[in-house]
Regions:
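Short recognition patches in nucleic-acid-associated and regulatory proteins
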Residues: 29-43
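Extended charged
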Residues: 1-29, 47-53, 61-124
Length: 124
């Protein structure tokens, strides 16, 4: 997938071109663009690779939002979701070369493998 501008994604790798709050799936009311990896030049990297999402203001800047004092869990969830999506088509080493670290710990990289034939059932 390539964005409209060379070397930059005009869409989010998590949401595509949809303009809806990532957490509430609503498109009404104001939405703010959140760069998933931010600070020290990371906003430009997030723009370049599509590492951003649309959020309602309370999910962005509210107390429990990604930038709020109680928002660590939702911030980490976004970072992990983004890394998982990136690793569907790229390696963990590529992600770490771009971002500088992994947010997935010991979680295996890449797409989940389909199980062997289970007689029509998908076992979780």
């Amino acid at each position: 997938m390539q964005g409209a501008r060379t070397g930059s994604h005009s869409y989010s790798i998590l949401q595509g071109k949809s303009k809806r709050c990532y957490f509430t799936d609503t498109e009404t009311g104001p939405l703010e663009r959140h760069h998933i990896y931010f600070g020290a030049g990371m906003r430009q990297i997030s723009d370049k690779h599509g590492f951003w999402v649309w959020l309602k203001p309370e999910w962005h800047r509210g107390t429990s939002g990604v930038h709020g004092r109680d928002g660590h869990k939702v911030d980490l969830r976004l970072k992990q979701d983004c890394q998982r999506r990136f690793e569907e088509t790229h390696s963990r080493e590529e992600f770490m070369a771009i971002i500088g670290r992994s947010y997935l710990g010991d979680e295996p990289e890449g797409k989940p493998q389909m199980p062997a034939d289970t007689g029509g059932f998908y076992l979780l």
